[in-house]
């Protein structure tokens, strides 16, 4: 159990049979009446966001989440298969569970999988990955005066905006949080 006074951004709670993550919170102490905590909660399963108010000191169950490092071994149809390298247990995830992390996932890459019981809530990739450019337009000489960018397709199929000097076959570093180009490798 956790008190509403202890809510912080990122705190996970169980409410109505679901896991919710505190996105925003505000402790309010009105001049008249009792204090309360106004929160914005995001459902960890569906992604929906709701606003909820709790009385100050109200206790709610804290969600017990387990984070396990697993390796992406292969893709079976439309499912992504991950293996726990300690217990050799497999977890099969569909594209909806993967979210945007599917754009930067390579075979044999390790990722942190967040579980609530036996249900997968989130896939957390490393903050940056090295990917090979498989498709991009050739850069034109003298076209760099403005420091422009061009679209490039990387080995996972994701599109990344890269500087004009990047060519096919080069390895680049990509931020998995927003898909931005970080540099050459």
Curated annotation (Swiss-Prot):
Protein biosynthesis is among the record's keywords: yes
Gene3D superfamilies linked to this entry: 2.30.30.30, Nucleic acid-binding proteins
Protein's cellular compartments: Cytoplasm
Superkingdom of source: Bacteria
Keywords: Cytoplasm, Elongation factor, Protein biosynthesis
An individual GO BP term: peptide biosynthetic process
Gene Ontology, cellular component aspect: cytoplasm
Main location: cytoplasm
Keyword Signal: no
Any GO molecular function: translation elongation factor activity
Entries under Pfam families matching the protein: EFP, EFP_N, Elong-fact-P_C
Pathway info: Protein biosynthesis; polypeptide chain elongation
Record-linked InterPro entries: Elong-fact-P_C, NA-bd_OB-fold, Rib_uL2_dom2, Transl_elong_fac_P/YeiP, Transl_elong_KOW-like, Transl_elong_P/YeiP_cen, Transl_elong_P/YeiP_CS, Transl_elongation_fac_P
Its biological purpose: Involved in peptide bond synthesis. Stimulates efficient translation and peptide-bond synthesis on native or reconstituted 70S ribosomes in vitro. Probably functions indirectly by altering the affinity of the ribosome for aminoacyl-tRNA, thus increasing their reactivity as acceptors for peptidyl transferase.
PANTHER family membership: ELONGATION FACTOR P, ELONGATION FACTOR P (EF-P) FAMILY PROTEIN
Family under the similarity heading: Belongs to the elongation factor P family.
Protein name as catalogued: Elongation factor P
Gene source species: Rippkaea orientalis (strain PCC 8801 / RF-1) (Cyanothece sp. (strain PCC 8801))
Taxonomic classification: Bacteria, Bacillati, Cyanobacteriota, Cyanophyceae, Oscillatoriophycideae
């Amino acid at each position: 159990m956790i008190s509403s006074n202890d809510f912080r951004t990122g705190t996970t709670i169980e409410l109505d049979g679901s896991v919710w993550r505190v996105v925003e919170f505000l402790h309010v102490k009105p001049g008249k009446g009792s204090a309360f905590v106004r929160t914005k909660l995001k459902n960890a399963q569906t992604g929906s966001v709701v606003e909820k108010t709790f009385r100050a000191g109200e206790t709610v169950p804290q969600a017990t989440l387990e984070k396990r490092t697993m390796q992406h071994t292969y893709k079976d149809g439309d499912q992504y298969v991950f293996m726990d390298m300690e217990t050799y247990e497999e977890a099969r995830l569909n594209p909806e569970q993967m979210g945007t992390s599917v754009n930067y996932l390579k075979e044999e890459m390790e990722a942190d999988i967040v579980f609530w019981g036996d249900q997968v809530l989130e896939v957390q990739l490393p903050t940056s990955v090295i990917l090979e450019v498989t498709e991009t337009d050739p850069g034109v000489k003298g076209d760099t005066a403005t420091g422009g960018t061009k679209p490039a397709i990387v080995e996972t199929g994701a599109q990344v905006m890269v500087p004009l000097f990047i060519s096919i076959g080069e390895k680049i570093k990509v931020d998995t949080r927003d898909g931005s180009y970080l540099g050459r490798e």
